């Protein structure tokens, strides 16, 4: 059973602002956004992220040198690896439009930009994402402006199957 991130507050989680990120209490674990996107705040090279990764139309990996994600090749129809220095929100939008369509599931094993979740959501893609840096994860979730629900790990398996 999903549980709300802040059941005890009257704060409107459907439209959090970056100023409210400290209030969101995002910590390591799984979150569902708007009842459809899954975000893991933790190491995406870990078995807990890879094991439940659905088959996706597109995976966009924006990373430096740290690569322990060979499993992506088996999970995605298309894999795009971008060096962090080459990433831009416009480039993300172009890749999403070129290599996927509304309704497709896309994967982001890193969230270097707080706008990645928002961009994919606005284009009608369903997102399976993660970010090891909890602060970056918190900012991306808050910047999305989407309703946030913390979920138990065993519930993730039901959502992706």
Put a short name on every predicted segment.
Residues 1-161:
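S-adenosyl-L-methionine-dependent nucleic acid methyltransferase catalytic domains
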């Amino acid at each position: 059973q999903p549980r709300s991130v802040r059941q005890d507050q009257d704060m409107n989680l459907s439209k959090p602002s970056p100023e409210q990120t400290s209030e969101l209490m995002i910590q390591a674990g799984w979150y569902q956004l708007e009842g459809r996107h899954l975000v893991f705040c933790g190491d995406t090279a870990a078995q807990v992220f890879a094991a439940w990764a659905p088959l996706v139309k597109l995976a966009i990996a924006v990373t430096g040198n740290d690569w322990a994600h060979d499993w992506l090749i088996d999970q995605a129809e298309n894999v795009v690896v971008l060096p962090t220095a080459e990433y831009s929100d416009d480039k993300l939008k172009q890749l999403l439009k070129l290599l996927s369509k509304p309704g497709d599931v896309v994967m982001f094993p890193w969230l270097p930009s707080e706008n990645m979740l928002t961009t994919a959501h606005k284009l009608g893609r369903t997102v399976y994402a993660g970010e090891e840096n909890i602060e970056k994860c918190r900012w991306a979730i808050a910047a999305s402006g989407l309703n946030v629900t913390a979920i138990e790990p065993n519930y993730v398996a039901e959502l992706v199957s």
